[in-house]
Amino acid sequence: MSKLIELSVSGQVLRLNCPPEQHDALRQAAHLLDNRVMEMRERTGILQMEKILSIVALNLSFELMQEQQKTQTIENVINQKIAQLEGSLENILAQKTTF
C-alpha cells in the first residue's frame, strides 16, 4: 500500500506516493539528486534550475547506461563460462559412460 512521502530537492518539496519499504531508497535518491544539482550549479554557474536539472538528468542517464553496459558484458562473460563448464561436464560424462 502506498504512503505519502515528502522529499526536498533544491529547496522544492516533492510529495510522492510510494510503498513504505521504498521510502529510504527514495530519500537516498533525492539526496543524491540534491547533491548533484548543487555540484552542477557550483561548477557551471548556471542559475536556471530547468537547465541544471536537464544536465544532471543527462549525466545520470549516461551513468546508468554505462552501468547497464558493464552489467551486460559481465552477464555475457558469465554465460560463456557456464557454456564452457557445461561442455566440459558433458565431455567428462560422455567419457565416463564409454568405460
UniProtKB/Swiss-Prot annotation:
SUPFAM superfamilies: Cell division protein ZapA-like
Main location: cytoplasm
Coiled coil ranges: 76-96
Pfam families: ZapA (PF05164)
Keyword Chaperone (UniProt): no
Functional note: Activator of cell division through the inhibition of FtsZ GTPase activity, therefore promoting FtsZ assembly into bundles of protofilaments necessary for the formation of the division Z ring. It is recruited early at mid-cell but it is not essential for cell division.
PANTHER family per the UniProt record, alphabetical: CELL DIVISION PROTEIN ZAPA
Family as reported in the entry's similarity comment: Belongs to the ZapA family. Type 1 subfamily.
Protein name: Cell division protein ZapA
Organism of provenance: Histophilus somni (strain 2336) (Haemophilus somnus)
Gene field: zapA
